[in-house]
Amino acid sequence: MSDAGTEEFDEEQGSLGEYEGDRNEAGERHGQGKAVLPRGDTYQGAYENGKRCGQGTYKFKNGARYTGEWYMNLKHGQGVLYYPDGSKYEGSWVDDQRQGHGVYTYPNGDTYDGEWLHHQRHGQGTYTHQETGSQYRGTWVVGNMESTGELIQLNHRYHGNFVNNNPSGPGKYVFDIGCEQHGEYFQLEPDKGEAEEDETLISTTLKWKPKAVTGLSV
């Protein structure tokens, strides 16, 4: 569920390169134009007073491509960024960062549809695993599943609290056969495994303690 492969790519800011297009009275790039930058990146779209501003497409030499809105040379507004690893982000940008609502499609086909802040999953969102169809719907904090959420699996779903991507505390399993199992997740004492010198290997184990089975709540 990591954002591996989502590193942003620096657009060339200081080097003007070659330009063909409209200019204003001051000689600045203004209107529609195309630029070929020294290291091989290209931009085609709108300029305002020498800055990328409005709709445009920026193609990176490494194969990444952004098509969407710009403001003061930064990705800002609605746009799509295609990454070299095959992943894609489509949604809102603020000051060159994924922020607001957007959909990220990962190289393995997994998707995250929800809120972002400073490039990270943050707020309400749904992560869907392409291979199994399982989903997490709920709250995210700085990229992790936190607070109230629902983990949906084949034939059942779990609703409860999450801490650092794991269920924690009271919750319930809801089964398609028409019943609910209420209980609590707690963390067992960590086991210290073998380690070299002063390193310590700690494995975290979660245990579900069932308390009651009821019919489906309305």
Swiss-Prot record:
GO terms for biological process: axoneme assembly; meiotic cell cycle; spermatid development. Its main location: cytoplasm. PANTHER family: RADIAL SPOKE HEAD 1 HOMOLOG (PTHR43215:SF14). It holds the Pfam family MORN. Testis-specific. Residues 1-48 are annotated as: Disordered. MORN repeats lie at residues 19-42, 43-65, 66-88, 89-111, 112-134, 158-180. Component of the axonemal radial spoke complexes. Interacts with septin SEPT7. One of its GO terms (cellular component) is 9+2 motile cilium. This is Radial spoke head 1 homolog. SMART domains: MORN. SUPFAM superfamilies: Histone H3 K4-specific methyltransferase SET7/9 N-terminal domain. Residues 20-31 have a biased composition (Basic and acidic residues). Residues 1-13 have a biased composition (Acidic residues). Functions as part of axonemal radial spoke complexes that play an important part in the motility of sperm and cilia. Keywords: Cell projection, Cilium, Cytoplasm, Cytoskeleton, Developmental protein, Differentiation, Flagellum, Meiosis, Repeat, Spermatogenesis. It is found in: Cytoplasm, Cytoskeleton, Cilium axoneme; Cytoplasm, Cytoskeleton, Flagellum basal body; Cytoplasm, Cytoskeleton, Flagellum axoneme. It comes from the Eukaryota. InterPro entries: MORN.
